[in-house]
Every structure is written in structure tokens, then in C-alpha cells.
Amino acid sequence: SLSVAFESVIATYNTNVGCGDVVAINANTGTYKATRSAINSFNTVPISSNSAVGTLSRDRLELWRSDLVRTIEYGHVEAPQEADQQPHPDCALTSALTRMELLAITDLCPDSITDGVALRFMSTTPEDSRQPEIKQSIDLEPHSTLVSIGQTAAAVYTPTTPAGTARITSFNQQGKELNAATVPSSPLLDGTAPTHHEDRTGVTTPQIADLPHHMSWFDGQRLYLFEPENLLISHIFEGALGTGIAVGGQLLYPNREGIAVADWNTGKILRVIPVDRQGYDGPVSLNQAGHTIIEQRDDTYVALN
């Protein structure tokens, strides 16, 4: 897998003991910055923030600092050095997000009475990286999954009845419910989008992006903006194709016609910049390199001048 953090490209390679060989390459010079090698799961996805990078799989999670030294591991440990250091080694992880010193995960445990999911908050840097320090655990309904995280809170998506609806609920790290809203069901999370949210790893990887004054999440058809402190939904942009970027104090995000320019304070779309994608109608996400806007269309990157 590949991820970007600490001004480096982090590449994780599969070996005969899992995806445990990791190389950090300086993005500016192309030189090696750090390496690590350890036992890991075979099917992993990257997880990262401005403060940490790591891998997530169905059975374990790891985070590393900029020199690739591990700061925390959670879940199944192949050869534990000491007994009883992991609080839930037999649980299956379903999603995870991290920001600053906060790590939030959802997992499903075989002894769950309600067959539900648990949301767990913990520090990214416990005193012993082998022994996670869980701050709070919250029982959730089945199929709940993380969609956003702030410095002190996280938001989860839960399918509800009737069909076609869902609920997004935010909790702080003390376990208090902050906000809840009924929303349309997510095509990515209910499996009706072209690219389902779960790949061969079996974990959910939400499509998120940071903006100057909001966190954002793309649900497969809509772009959600969350307030950073309490993760209250401030705006929902229908017809989006993916996550957007901030340019000149405004939100730019992809839609069918091109790139929509929106006011993130009011939620009003100001104009749409036409883009000819030459028949491509799949997901699109925006990035920026200098003054150039980059569209990622599946595995293809297109520079727009």
C-alpha cells in the first residue's frame, strides 16, 4: 500500500510474514528516510494523519511516527512478548481513523451480546506501544462505521430503517453523544456504488479530506462538511463525485458537469467550471500541486490548467 505523511511517501510491501516491510522516501529528494520490518497482516490498507501513519487490517492496526518507530499496535499479535497486553485480541476491526493524539476504531467482537459494533477511543502514543490505553468504549448498532474524526471526537454512520436512510452520530472521547442526524443512505456504505467500501481487507476505508474549517467525507453521491470540534454536519453537497480542496477561501469539488465552486460558509454553489472527462463517469477526487488542480480518476491523474 502507499500513503503520504511527514513530507514522505510511505510504501508497505508484502513479504512471507505479511505487509510488514515499510520504506519512507523523502518526497522532495527521492532519498530513503526510514525503514522498518516486522510481522503484519497480509491484507492491509494505509491509515494516516498529519501526526501518524500505519496500516489497518481486519485483525490488527499499527501506527508509526515519522521515523517509522511503532507508537501503538491494537488487535491480534502473532508472537506476544507478554500476556494480556491487548484488550481485545479476538475482535475484528471494521474501521479506524486518527488525528493528532486521538485514535478511534470500530470493531466487532465474538462475545458481543447485541451482535453490534463497539467504538473505542484511545491515545496514539500509550506508554507502551504494545499495550493500548482505551479511554472509552461505546456500543453501537450493527454495521456502524467511522466516517470522520476530529481532535477530540469521532462521527459514525449507522444504517437505519426504513431502507434508504441512515444516521450519523458524533461522540466525544469521553463517550458523550454530541450530535445525531438522519441522512440518506450512502451508496459507498450500502454496496450500491461501483466501488464498494470493503475490499479484500474487509475493513471500511472512508473517503475523507481536510479543509481549513471543516472535515469532509464523500459518501458515494454527496460531500459532507463537518465542523471540526463537535463534528456537526454543516453542509451536504449533492451530486458530488468525490472529495474536494480549498482554493482562494472557497471549496472546489468534482461533479458531473466539472468542478463546482462553493461557499463553505453558506453551502451555496457559486459556479461550475466545465471539465471534459471524455466519457469517464466514475469517482473523482481533487488535489492541488502548486497552482495546478489534479483530478484523480480511478487510477489516472489528470492535471487541469
Language model segments and positions:
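Aromatic (tryptophan-biased) beta-strands that constitute blades/sheets of beta-rich domains
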Residues: 1, 26-38, 68-81, 129-138, ...
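Generic low-polarity alpha-helical segments
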Residues: 1, 9, 30, 68, ...
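Repeated scaffold domains used in trafficking and secretory/extracellular systems
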Residues: 1-7, 37-51, 81-96, 137-152, ...
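Long, acidic/polar, low-complexity amphipathic helices and coiled-coil-like
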Residues: 2-123, 127-129
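Residue position within the beta-strands of beta-propeller blades
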Residues: 11-12, 55, 105, 154-158, ...
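Structural motif
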Residues: 17-24, 58-65, 108-122, 161-170, ...
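Acidic, serine/threonine- and glycine-rich low-complexity intrinsically disordered segments
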Residues: 73-75, 79-226
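C-terminal closing repeat unit and adjoining cap/tail of repeat-based domains
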Residues: 219-233, 246-305
